[in-house]
């Protein structure tokens, strides 16, 4: 029996994708091979690779000025890879810290430069807001400005993206990429691990403006140098072939759903239902300012936290899994990525109401 999986990542996958992957496991399109067994330079995998790149470009509307790269290492590795590729002759990068992940990015950058804290969304209740552009205090000559546009742990999403002129904007989009349309031209770099909305863990997507490919530090390993990866069409070293294949199936699935406009409408409906339930209750609490609430990751707390384990046990009994909040903040967290259906959110809301009524 399939359950409703609210994991923050690795996360729920579209059932259609899982079934297609299962059907093709032993024999991909009459090749007699599993995708796992293919040479990454053979014609079979090359067709998978090129289709994935093309479909992602179509879905996001990536302009010709930007290259799409498939790398490894996840978002954590990109926290080091970004400064090694973008600092050039500069020694400062600016950071807008809106939660735990951008805080990690800020800390990692200290190994390569003197990072400048341009703005913070931290309040007495933790990270609960997204600073406006007017609050950003940029340094005089930063190599780039870093922003995590959706904080997976804290549930803070930044929707208003400013134009920074000549300063490249770098965005960690790991946990909301493909959940809504984006103006990719506004960004110098977008990066994200796949294991939330793109597919399975193992591949990292980087979208970089082509004119930024000549800034790498001499210490940057060639396997992580974007210019080298771009020149070799993401095949400089053996790529995570099966993860790219799964990502390609997800891209095709998204197209069949009507693209990102249709997906965004679904995600708005799902998140509104859950937030409305929380706000109407005196038993559940979300601390994030409404304008900055994530559509993908919804943290909430029980008024009586001694009931946390009872809540989780009851949810599991109903087939509602992976609702425990991150250890750094506690409480609960429902990650409602693209693959989580509206029926799953309705089932969660029904359970939350039943649990509150029973507790009362």
Curated annotation (Swiss-Prot):
Keywords: Amino-acid biosynthesis, Aminotransferase, Cytoplasm, Pyridoxal phosphate, Pyridoxine biosynthesis, Serine biosynthesis, Transferase. GO terms for cellular component: cytoplasm. SUPFAM superfamilies: PLP-dependent transferases. Pfam families: Aminotran_5. It is an enzyme of class 2 (transferase). Binds 1 pyridoxal phosphate per subunit. It catalyses: O-phospho-L-serine + 2-oxoglutarate = 3-phosphooxypyruvate + L-glutamate; 4-(phosphooxy)-L-threonine + 2-oxoglutarate = (R)-3-hydroxy-2-oxo-4-phosphooxybutanoate + L-glutamate. One of its GO terms (biological process) is pyridoxine biosynthetic process. Homodimer. This is Phosphoserine aminotransferase. It comes from Burkholderia cenocepacia (strain ATCC BAA-245 / DSM 16553 / LMG 16656 / NCTC 13227 / J2315 / CF5610) (Burkholderia cepacia (strain J2315)). The lineage of its organism: Bacteria, Pseudomonadati, Pseudomonadota, Betaproteobacteria, Burkholderiales.
